[in-house]
């Protein structure tokens, strides 16, 4: 209705009468618009264009008391009253780029379901692994971390298979890099998948976990992974001094570009059970409390943080995630380095179980838990929900 037929003499009155008419005629091929000054003159003359009326005040339910407005200056709810405002003022965001996808691999061809972790599998390294990575990349997840299920026959007290350059992890890294050169591959550096004792280090006759001898083995493992093409090696063993020794070993072999993500604050948690089932890596005796941190301790995380920083760590990780939000925030507030959080198998399985029993909304709880880890200060999150959450973020539920 802002067009005037050039066959008729153009006047403002003609225009206004045309605008208010109910006729539905298509405009002629050649049309002109009234000028801004014409519109302004019409408004000044009192010919105000029609617009929707002022909306009525919404009715309150019957029985609502009539009270004076509270004498308060700030009403935080004003900034929450619409989706657009809530989105504009959102302080924390979540993106598929924030996720590192943990993948279990094994020597077989079949993808084997993990009973305690619904939706997770031990992937065949030749095919299942490539297919799962392709799915993740399709929704923006381009970082993975590999965890191997090692045959019992290859496990030894000193975990020598950990640095076999033709072993399962180095082979898988080479395969992935050949197919997806830009994929970021994190690796786990620890002896427990390779140890006949199921511990992260070499076990002495009296049950003591040997620190320095274990670090020697871990350095060889990290170098083997770097040589295969790993982008980030991630010592999860909690041995003292391993980050510095690993940095020296990597640099000596020409891998100055390979990063170290240290499991800085890895707690001796009960949330790891499903993971150990997935890898068949439960300790054959005892527990891991002499090297993993006491869940009761807070300040100790600062000690570990300072050591890892001074030894050359590039990323600091907290494990588990959601029960240790205070530790994530502690590291975030005291270190300039990137912070990672590991949403571990127990956290994942609890959400899955609650969802399956219809006790919670699985998708909403999943997304809230990940957002909370980000809000606490995590730059990246290792999560078994990586693919599912990324699909949700992309609006693609499959």
Swiss-Prot record:
Belongs to the ALAD family. One of its GO terms (biological process) is protoporphyrinogen IX biosynthetic process. 5-aminolevulinate 1 binds at residues 276, 288. It comes from the Eukaryota. GO terms for cellular component: chloroplast; cytosol. Activated by magnesium. Inhibited by succinyl acetone. Enzyme activity may depend on the oligomerization state, where the fully active octamer may dissociate and reassemble into less active lower oligomers. The keyword Oxidoreductase does not apply. NCBIfam families: PRK09283.1. Residues 74-83 have a biased composition (Basic residues). Its main location: plastid. It is found in: Plastid, Chloroplast. It comes from Pisum sativum (Garden pea). This is Delta-aminolevulinic acid dehydratase, chloroplastic. Pathway: Porphyrin-containing compound metabolism; protoporphyrin-IX biosynthesis; coproporphyrinogen-III from 5-aminolevulinate: step 1/4. PANTHER family: DELTA-AMINOLEVULINIC ACID DEHYDRATASE. GO terms for molecular function: porphobilinogen synthase activity; zinc ion binding. Residues 60-69 have a biased composition (Low complexity). Its EC number is 4.2.1.24. Keywords: Allosteric enzyme, Chlorophyll biosynthesis, Chloroplast, Heme biosynthesis, Lyase, Magnesium, Metal-binding, Plastid, Porphyrin biosynthesis, Transit peptide. Catalyzes an early step in the biosynthesis of tetrapyrroles. Binds two molecules of 5-aminolevulinate per subunit, each at a distinct site, and catalyzes their condensation to form porphobilinogen. Homooctamer; formed by oligomerization of dimers. Probably also forms lower oligomers. 5-aminolevulinate 2 binds at residues 345, 384. It catalyses: 2 5-aminolevulinate = porphobilinogen + 2 H2O + H(+).
